[in-house]
Amino acid sequence: MGLAEGLAARMAPHLYIQEPLSAQQLKKLEEHKYSASGRSLVEPPMQVYWNWLVEKVPLWLAPNTITMVGLLLNVLSTLILVCYCPTATEGAPFWTYLLCAIGLFVYQSLDAIDGKQARRTNSSSPLGEMFDHGCDSISIVFVNLGTIAAVRLGTLPGWMFYCCFVGMFMFYCAQWQTYVCGTLKFGIIDVTELQISVTVMFLMTAVCGPELWDYEIPFTGLPMKTIPLLGIIGGTVYSCSNYFRVILSGGVGKNGSTVAGTSVLSPGLHIGLVLLLALMIYKKSTTNLFLQNPCLYTLAFGFVSAKITIKLVIAHMTKSEISLQDTAFIGPGLLFFNQYFNSFIDEYIVLWIAMVISFADLLRYCISVCLQIATHLRISVFRISSNQAAEQVQTQKQKLTD
């Protein structure tokens, strides 16, 4: 057992960590085989870079370690920017935007090669697939934060709310689609295109300053930030139309159900509840809670979204039902009931409490599920074990890819 796993195991009793997966789920997990189809627009040229990059990685480095390093760089660089721009209306030093560009590009690169490293070292396992998607669900929250801060979307409150939550929704829908049809489907415009576009946006802000996005587009009267907004809207329409075409066409289960034999619409309740609570609390706040604290607000709900997305990924891999009852909703619930009782506690204080609870709940769940799966498969989370799980990769793609 590695240092990180050993530390997590020693912390487990103090964090009240329980094993979240049943014996039946673990058995189904062993039988899971990764299946993906399609390719995005920039993937072919990027494959050349990814194949070159993975050859530079030492064989002793575990795939999950690669992903985690990328995620930490992405998160830390975004948090530095957020410290300068807590309301997404401020400017920040040029190096913070440059740092975000580097952090996101490094994450994209490392996230793209972790699967290649797993196959290269014969260390592919269901844990790696779950870990990869789990990191993506957290990264998307911070990509949203970096985007609104870089283009100063705080000057357009309604659009800022949209951009904060639409990324979480689309990533959840991608996993929802997989839960229905059993195959992860990549579109022409997908997450790689999003990450590269946001990286370019960070670089433009670093070179030209955040004032760039406030300049007026000639003959339109619209600010420059309208351009990335239109891109986000177009991407949302394109991606969601693809997702829901698959979802509404019926699943691979009995009578067109999901892989778990449940209704294809049932996962919509979870993300729907997150978005509904976020919107209601935003609109009903007497202190403009979201407008005054958009980054903190997004984190509080983003951690909830990340957890339910991870649980949906696991539900797909274990062919099991995803329950609506979840401790992830405690934080948003506190905000809702505080408003219901006329905000007898300062909303800002409750928001901090909700964010801490949501983060702690996500951390507890991630640690417990990783340790449980690793123990069951007799592998290490952050090291390449001598006793690795058997290769369980079945791909319909014609090249190596995640």
UniProtKB/Swiss-Prot annotation:
The keyword Lipid metabolism applies. Changing H133A: Almost completely abolishes the enzymatic activity. Changing Y34A: Reduces the enzymatic activity to about 35% of that of the wild type. Changing D132A: Reduces the enzymatic activity to about 20% of that of the wild type. The keyword Transferase applies. GO terms for cellular component: endoplasmic reticulum membrane; Golgi apparatus; Golgi membrane. The chain crosses the membrane at residues 63-83, 94-118, 126-150, 161-179, 191-207, 223-248, 266-281, 294-316, 330-339, 347-376. It catalyses: CDP-choline + a 1,2-diacyl-sn-glycerol = a 1,2-diacyl-sn-glycero-3-phosphocholine + CMP + H(+); 1,2-dioctanoyl-sn-glycerol + CDP-choline = 1,2-dioctanoyl-sn-glycero-3-phosphocholine + CMP + H(+); 1-octadecanoyl-2-(5Z,8Z,11Z,14Z-eicosatetraenoyl)-sn-glycerol + CDP-choline = 1-octadecanoyl-2-(5Z,8Z,11Z,14Z-eicosatetraenoyl)-sn-glycero-3-phosphocholine + CMP + H(+); 1-hexadecanoyl-2-(9Z-octadecenoyl)-sn-glycerol + CDP-choline = 1-hexadecanoyl-2-(9Z-octadecenoyl)-sn-glycero-3-phosphocholine + CMP + H(+). Its EC number is 2.7.8.2. It is an enzyme of class 2 (transferase). Residues 1-62, 119-125, 180-190, 249-265, 317-329, 377-402 are cytoplasmic. Pfam families: CDP-OH_P_transf. The record marks E129 as: Increases basicity of active site His. Residues 84-93, 151-160, 208-222, 282-293, 340-346 are lumenal. CDP-choline binds at N64, R119. Catalyzes the final step of de novo phosphatidylcholine (PC) synthesis, i.e. the transfer of choline phosphate from CDP-choline to the free hydroxyl of a diacylglycerol (DAG), producing a PC. It thereby plays a central role in the formation and maintenance of vesicular membranes. Shows a high preference for CDP-choline over CDP-ethanolamine as substrate. Homodimer. Belongs to the CDP-alcohol phosphatidyltransferase class-I family. This is Cholinephosphotransferase 1. It comes from Xenopus laevis (African clawed frog).
